[in-house]
Design a protein with these regions (language model features):
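Zinc-dependent metalloendopeptidases
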Residues: 2-272
């Protein structure tokens, strides 16, 4: 029993090591990092149950498309009115209150603040420390990188696990979900721009590629969006699950930060 437990812990640590090393390779897009980290941490959560070891704060969540929390207060991911978006104040700024878990180190907090500042410098969105607001982001180190879509009301968790999620681009990705943005590959006109290779996707995960009835804000499909899946997301054989059309050589997925079109969409949605 002891030997089996030791092997399980070793496998877990190796998984963490592989997930964290992704940040060292610029060819790995942000969504691929998120999916890998979430898979590793899910395995860690399962092992922690069997070994009675608490590895991260919080519990395993049911995630859609790899990093989207299914909201409990509304029908699926459908947002039919402005209640899903954060309100603009009279000064023209959109304030998004947040709290930050005490488990984050000074370095973690610096990275999170830097990612938030990127929104401040390019949009009218302002992430502000919560005072007494009812609706706010509760940024915590749970078991993965994930968020709701848009404002759900009350305290809504944005998970940035300290075991791999506290990186500039990943934080931008999850905060952009919280502002109301879906993954780019699920937008309603997706099939004009990419081909989904269903034969390379496990049937149990094909729902991650379902189209959404999205408001595309009269913007172009953005292959370089921070919200775009990488080529092999949810692949069962290492082959591409997403192929750009008509030119399959086009780079897809963002490796660093919000794209110009990501910024345009935020400013358009919130009328900055």
């Amino acid at each position: 029993m002891e030997s089996r437990a030791s092997l399980s812990i070793l496998a877990l640590l190796l998984g963490f090591s592989q997930a964290l090393s992704l940040d060292q390779h610029e060819h790995v897009d942000i969504t691929s990092r998120i999916l890998t980290i979430n898979n590793v941490l899910l395995i860690g959560f399962i092992l922690s149950l069997s070994l009675c070891v608490l590895l991260v704060e919080g519990s395993s969540e049911l995630l859609l498309e790899g990093d989207i929390l299914l909201p409990k207060g509304r029908n699926g991911l459908v947002c039919s009115d402005s209640s899903c978006f954060w309100k603009k104040s009279s000064d023209g700024l959109v304030e998004v209150p947040y709290t930050l878990s005490s488990v984050f180190s000074f370095t973690d907090r610096t990275v999170i603040a830097s990612a938030m500042a990127s929104f401040h410098s390019k949009t009218c969105v302002r992430f502000v420390p919560r005072t007494n607001q009812t609706s706010y982001l509760s940024i915590e180190s749970k078991d993965g990188c994930y968020s709701n879509i848009g404002k759900t009301g009350g305290a809504q968790v944005v998970s940035l696990s300290r075991f791999g999620c506290v990186y500039y681009g990943i934080i931008e990705h999850e905060l952009n979900h919280a502002l109301g943005f879906y993954h780019e590959h699920t937008r309603s006109d997706r099939d004009k721009y990419v081909k989904i290779n269903w034969e390379n996707i496990d049937p149990t995960t094909q729902s991650n590629f379902n189209l959404k009835n999205t408001n595309n804000l009269n913007t172009l499909y953005d292959y370089s969006s921070v919200m775009h899946y990488g080529r092999t997301a949810f692949s069962i054989n290492g082959l591409d699950t997403i192929t750009p059309i008509p030119d399959p050589s086009v780079n897809i997925g963002q490796r660093k930060e919000l794209s110009a079109i990501d910024i345009l969409r935020i400013n358009t949605l919130y009328k900055c």
